[in-house]
Amino acid sequence: MQLFLLLCLVLLSPQGASLHRHHPREMKKRVEDLHVGATVAPSSRRDFTFDLYRALASAAPSQSIFFSPVSISMSLAMLSLGAGSSTKMQILEGLGLNLQKSSEKELHRGFQQLLQELNQPRDGFQLSLGNALFTDLVVDLQDTFVSAMKTLYLADTFPTNFRDSAGAMKQINDYVAKQTKGKIVDLLKNLDSNAVVIMVNYIFFKAKWETSFNHKGTQEQDFYVTSETVVRVPMMSREDQYHYLLDRNLSCRVVGVPYQGNATALFILPSEGKMQQVENGLSEKTLRKWLKMFKKRQLELYLPKFSIEGSYQLEKVLPSLGISNVFTSHADLSGISNHSNIQVSEMVHKAVVEVDESGTRAAAATGTIFTFRSARLNSQRLVFNRPFLMFIVDNNILFLGKVNRP
């Protein structure tokens, strides 16, 4: 019997603009509140988020990357509820949980609190995170597992007839489409005949920039994918005061562009040829340092409009982080079902990000070719015209990615 995990993610950002701005003290509070995995793994002894990023980057060094650390960590934590022996230990250690300093119960309570916080109604942007369990009628799930999924992870549960594969796919795809506001449709193209349980985790985020980019300032410019490959992209521009820093140790520049509400997009531009150096230096400590050292600076910011999608078979990636047992015939998932032959055969993760002047999908790049205007005195020009990194943070790292080719 096979257990499938589908992580269905969508990020739409930003849309529109507001008139208020972040005060420096608000950014300082974000640093103090930022969990960067602390909610996921109390007393963490490793950076799961950044280890996973490096594993994905290593597997496809020339491709763009986009994923949600919160969503993947939550899915693994849910799995650990039903895992036993070495299977559970691998998952918890892979997440970085030090069981000598914190309890497994703290992990699940942390996620319960995170779900409640992230799903609170907010002004200026939409953020929802949730889980669902689709179970075949022939499978007996452990009552304790179902109860924990409902109480700790607020999961919806649905009886599903997997023998009717077309009907099961429609049921699951319709649910995913509804939760992602129609952004992800037909997630399942086919369904394994041995499937008996499907766990779904989704996150939806749609935000407005605090100050939008002017469509009239968008212009076609060169983007240097490599020294040999140059593509034309619609480049947005806006002169304003931004949170900014130059990290000389990692040879990169970091700028924070706030959304309405409490979320911020961080864009990291490595110096030429220094992408791998920056990737190797990513850590919770590094991110905290960046946020703490931000200073307001007048910048003329040039940022490409882009849309990238990340789709990953995590059963092929997580073993490099020490999480392998759950994907084999040796898996102990006795806490999910009393069937001895149940294992996770597939763990699918899909994420989409769209960034433009206002977040409207229908907005198109202008066909007019402009030239860069001269920057004002005391205003520094920062042009993202080569591969860069992107974070979306809201007390936690919601999304992390690399834009290799917009």
Curated annotation (Swiss-Prot):
UniProt effect for mutating residue 274 to E: Does not inhibit thrombomodulin-enhanced rate of thrombin inhibition in presence of heparin
* Name of the protein: Plasma serine protease inhibitor
Q: What is known of its domains?
A: The reactive center loop (RCL) extends out from the body of the protein and directs binding to the target protease. The protease cleaves the serpin at the reactive site within the RCL, establishing a covalent linkage between the carboxyl group of the serpin reactive site and the serine hydroxyl of the protease. The resulting inactive serpin-protease complex is highly stable.
Q: What is the effect of changing residue 55 to V?
A: In allele PCI*B
Q: Which residues are glycosylated?
A: 39, 249, 262, 338
Q: Where is the signal peptide?
A: 1-19
Q: In which tissues is it expressed?
A: Predominantly expressed in the epithelium of seminal vesicles. Expressed in the proximal tubular epithelium of the kidney. Expressed in the superficial and more differentiated epidermal keratinocytes of the skin. Expressed in megakaryocytes and platelets. Expressed poorly in kidney tumor cells compared to non tumor kidney tissues. Expressed in spermatozoa. Present in very high concentration in seminal plasma. Present in high concentration in plasma, synovial and Graaf follicle fluids. Present in low concentration in breast milk and in amniotic fluids.
The cellular location(s) given in this protein's UniProt record come to: Secreted, Extracellular space
Per UniProt, which keywords does this protein have?
Fertilization, Glycoprotein, Heparin-binding, Lipid transport, Protease inhibitor, Secreted, Serine protease inhibitor, Signal, Transport
Q: What is the effect of changing residue 272 to K?
A: Does not inhibit thrombomodulin-enhanced rate of thrombin inhibition in presence of heparin
Briefly state the modifications made to the protein after translation. Answer: N- and O-glycosylated. N-glycosylation consists of a mixture of sialylated bi- (including sialyl-Lewis X epitopes), tri- and tetra-antennary complex-type chains; affects the maximal heparin- and thrombomodulin-enhanced rates of thrombin inhibition. O-glycosylated with core 1 or possibly core 8 glycans. Further modified with 2 sialic acid residues. Proteolytically cleaved. Inhibition of proteases is accompanied by formation of a stable enzyme-inhibitor complex and by degradation of the serpin to lower molecular weight derivatives. Proteolytically cleaved at the N-terminus; inhibits slightly the heparin- and thrombomodulin-enhanced rates of thrombin inhibition.
Q: What is the effect of changing residue 253 to E?
A: Inhibits strongly thrombomodulin-enhanced rate of thrombin inhibition in presence of heparin
| Organism for this UniProt entry | Homo sapiens (Human)
> What InterPro entries does this protein map onto?
Serpin_CS, Serpin_dom, Serpin_fam, Serpin_sf, Serpin_sf_1, Serpin_sf_2
Spell out the PROSITE patterns in the cross-references: SERPIN
Q: Which gene encodes it?
A: SERPINA5
**Family in the record:** Belongs to the serpin family.
Question: MF terms per GO, please?
Answer: acrosin binding; glycosaminoglycan binding; heparin binding; phosphatidylcholine binding; protease binding; retinoic acid binding; serine-type endopeptidase inhibitor activity
- Give residue numbers for the site Reactive bond: 373-374
Mind telling me which GO cellular component terms the entry cites? acrosomal membrane; external side of plasma membrane; extracellular exosome; extracellular region; extracellular space; membrane; platelet alpha granule; platelet dense tubular network
Task: Please describe, based on the UniProt annotation, the reported consequence of changing residue 376 to P.
Answer: Does not change inhibition of thrombin, activated protein C/F5 and factor XI/F11 activities
Q: What is the effect of changing residue 360 to R?
A: Inhibits heterodimer formation with TMPRSS11E
Which positions carry the propeptide annotation? 20-25
Q: Which PANTHER family match?
A: PLASMA SERINE PROTEASE INHIBITOR, SERINE PROTEASE INHIBITOR, SERPIN
Query: Impact of mutating residue 248 to E?
Result: Does not change the rate of thrombin or activated protein C/F5 inhibition in the presence or absence of heparin. Strongly reduces the rate of thrombin inhibition in the presence of heparin
Name one process (GO BP) from the record. Answer: lipid transport
